[in-house]
Curated annotation (Swiss-Prot):
Binding positions (ATP): 32-39
Sequence similarity: Belongs to the RapZ-like family.
Entry keyword S-adenosyl-L-methionine: no
Molecular-function GO terms, alphabetical: ATP binding; GTP binding
Pfam families: PapZ_C, RapZ-like_N
Keyword Nucleotide-binding part of the UniProt annotation: yes
Role of this protein: Displays ATPase and GTPase activities.
Originating species: Psychrobacter cryohalolentis (strain ATCC BAA-1226 / DSM 17306 / VKM B-2378 / K5)
Keywords: ATP-binding, GTP-binding, Nucleotide-binding
Name used for this protein in its record: Nucleotide-binding protein Pcryo_0127
Top-level lineage group: Bacteria
Residues the entry annotates as binding GTP: 82-85
Length: 320
């Protein structure tokens, strides 16, 4: 009965607060794999105007949200939760997630999951000489049935599954430096009242982006790399555009991808999504994927409904 009363009080205060200000409420629950950069994400979110709390026990998330939103009137909140939270809290995340949505509204609550590829996590732990949280003590390692770093990483994936399945935003930091991470987060949360479509060109030879919602492979198209005069150019250069103009299949593929995205992105975004990442890949991420990503940005910005922002990023730009 007391819990229901608290929820009712929170909803009443929230309604009053929203009516008195035009600010949009945003509650981010930030979680993810150890070594993936959750603390960096929370620090950046703080720079972007969020009130950030790290390493919060999951069971205290509803209470923290109520105190910050209803008692203090804070509108942008990022609450960090990691594997150190009690196991019972993790298994109860469905109920916690539903409670937050019911209290503050579907669009106000977002789960952000930060991850990285296993080899990247291993390299980071080795470089910093830090111990994975599941291996802090030998006795704890035995208790968790993990005896080495790869086993701890694998075990953590299983334990965090209740949070991962609710993730609205997934960020893979494997190939991001701190500046790129800040730019990515700004795209996700820095534009109020807008939905962001992130177009990302990349090279398959450097690995596929695991945080993409859609991946299109354009390696079947003619490759300017084999033209010696174009090898040093990129898909943003006029001479590469002229090269592609001689191949109608390039325009056809660009049009087909645009048609697919125009048809399905609006429906995809109706599921309370604030961002969608569309990755376009070629071999090296320099010519074909860059060209198509740029042209898709122009086409989608003019054809998608109002309120959608389309950004274009080129993951391999530092390699050009």
């Amino acid at each position: 009965m007391q819990a229901n009363q608290d929820t009712h009080n929170a909803q009443s205060k929230l309604t009053d607060s929203n009516e008195s200000t035009g600010d949009k409420l945003s509650i981010l629950v930030v979680s993810g794999r150890s070594g993936s950069g959750k603390t960096s994400v929370l620090n950046i979110l703080e720079d972007l105007g969020f009130y950030s709390i790290d390493n919060l026990p999951l069971s205290l998330v509803p209470e923290a949200a109520q105190k910050l939103v209803c008692d203090s009137g804070i509108k942008r909140i990022a609450l960090g939760v990691d594997i150190r939270t009690p196991r019972a809290d993790l298994s109860n995340f469905d109920a916690i997630h539903d409670s937050l949505k019911q209290t503050y509204g579907e669009e106000a609550v977002t789960v952000m999951y930060v991850t990285a590829q296993e080899e990247t996590l291993v390299a980071r732990f080795n470089a910093t000489r830090r111990i994975h949280p599941l291996m802090v003590l030998d006795t704890k390692g035995v208790e968790n049935n993990v005896y080495n770093l790869p086993a701890a990483i694998e075990k953590e994936i299983q334990l965090l599954q209740p949070i991962f399945k609710h993730a609205d935003i997934k960020i893979d930091t494997s190939m991001l430096n701190i500046h790129q991470l800040k730019e990515r987060l700004r795209d996700y949360v820095g534009v109020d009242n807008q939905i962001v479509i992130n177009l990302l060109s990349f090279g398959f030879k450097y690995g596929s982006p695991i945080d993409a919602d859609f991946v299109f492979d354009v390696r079947i198209l003619p490759n300017p790399h084999w033209n010696p005069t174009l090898r040093s150019a990129t898909g943003l250069d006029a001479e590469v555009s002229a090269f592609f103009a001689d191949y109608p299949e390039v325009a056809e593929m660009t049009g087909d991808i645009a048609t697919f995205l125009n048809r399905w992105l609006p429906d995809f975004l109706h599921n309370n999504r604030h961002t969608v990442t569309v990755a376009i890949g070629c071999t090296g991420g320099k010519h074909r994927s860059v060209f198509i990503t740029k042209h898709l940005q122009d086409r989608l910005q003019n054809s998608l409904p109002e309120g959608l922002t389309v950004t274009a990023k080129h993951r391999e730009k530092h390699r050009w």
